[in-house]
Curated annotation (Swiss-Prot):
Subcellular location: Nucleus
Biased composition (Polar residues): 293-305
UniProt GO BP: regulation of transcription by RNA polymerase II
InterPro entries: Histone_AcTrfase_su3
An example Gene Ontology CC term for this record: nucleus
Coiled coil regions, renumbered to chain: 335-398
GO terms for MF: transcription coactivator activity
Region (Disordered): 90-124, 275-315
Cited function: Functions as a component of the PCAF complex. The PCAF complex is capable of efficiently acetylating histones in a nucleosomal context.
Swiss-Prot/TrEMBL keywords: Coiled coil, Nucleus, Transcription, Transcription regulation
Record bears the keyword Cell inner membrane: no
Full protein name: Transcriptional adapter 3-B
Principal location class: nucleus
Amino acid sequence: MSELKDCPLQFHDFKSVDHVKLCPRYTAVLSRSEDDGIGIEELDTLQLELETLLSSASRRLRVLEAETQILTDWQDKKGDRRFLKLGKEHELGTPIKHSKPKKQKLDGKGSHASGPGPGRPKSRIMQQKMQEYEFTDDPVDVPRIPKNDAPNRFWASVEPYCADITNDEIKVLEDLLKTPEDEADYYKIPPLGKHYSQRWAQEDLLEEQKDGARAALSGDKKKGILGPLAELDSKDVDSLLKKSESQHDQPEDGCPFGHLTQRLLQALVEENIISPVEDSPIPEISGKESGTDGASTSPRSQNKPFSAPHTKSLEVRIKEELISQGLLESDDRPADDSEDEVLAELRKRQAELKALSAHNRAKKQELLRLAKEEMNRQELRQRVRMADNEVMDAFRKIMAARQKKRTPTKKEKDQAWKALKERESILKLLDG
């Protein structure tokens, strides 16, 4: 029981923070579901409430660390009761008085003599104890309070957003408004390359050419057989491909003319000008004529498809003439482009990029205008601070004159009125 009474612990009563009263926003956020989330407008209030909880927790932590340190020191020095007694007197503020060794009274003149006697060893023991007490009587080390850097780090992170605008930042905004040199490259449409079937066919022929060249090196016989194929170049490959396409690219109806030429001829030919075959009489053909015609015609000539030269150039000329006469609308781009999904997506993204660039440019111009206005306000605020200093100087001079029990001079009064009027004019400019 005596040890419990001598315990230096204070047993602080920690008061918990009432979250409902002091942190209502924090309590409301905890009661929400995960899908609701936190709004941007709630962040400032949440920050203040979290700082309140942090300060309360750090305060309790410091008190607990102090109690732990006191308990540790008390356990280390628990065996020495006299030290505890001296420690209590030291805590109460009473000066520590060490008892002096009592001198042995001697009768007569020999009282001051330092002769051998039983009191001599006793004084030595007392002095040794006093030195021991003085050595061990150290004040209790005050626990070091942990440094709370959270507010300092917070304000250091916020400072760049609240600091004054400088000329370097204005220059950065002006540089951002300059049109980049490569902006036009983003709106260019690359030319349409070859179709994959043509490209693959050309690659196959080139591969065969390389294989033939390798095979030709192995023997003279193979070289004689594959020699013409090995000597082909890229131009010869293209000519071969065009030739094969022209051979296989025959219209279904066997007509060599283009669709526009056929449509034009169909529009010019009048309908029902030929009588039906059933009503028209069949002319009789003489034997000579039939014989000569039969001899002149052959099955091979009948199976040969009809061909006419310069059909493609005729198609192009007819189209140009119809466009010049206004009978046909000109297309800005080929008809195949409308079916090109890649080109349509590219044009769509380019339009979005152009709209986004215009929006960003407008916002940058607005930001530059606001920054320049804020620079002017900063200069006015600096002038207001200088005017405040002048007003305070004039006020101090007038107060010093009154303390010396003399009336302020006319110069001091005029200086004070001038500073006040100048300050009012600057404030009007700042408010306006």
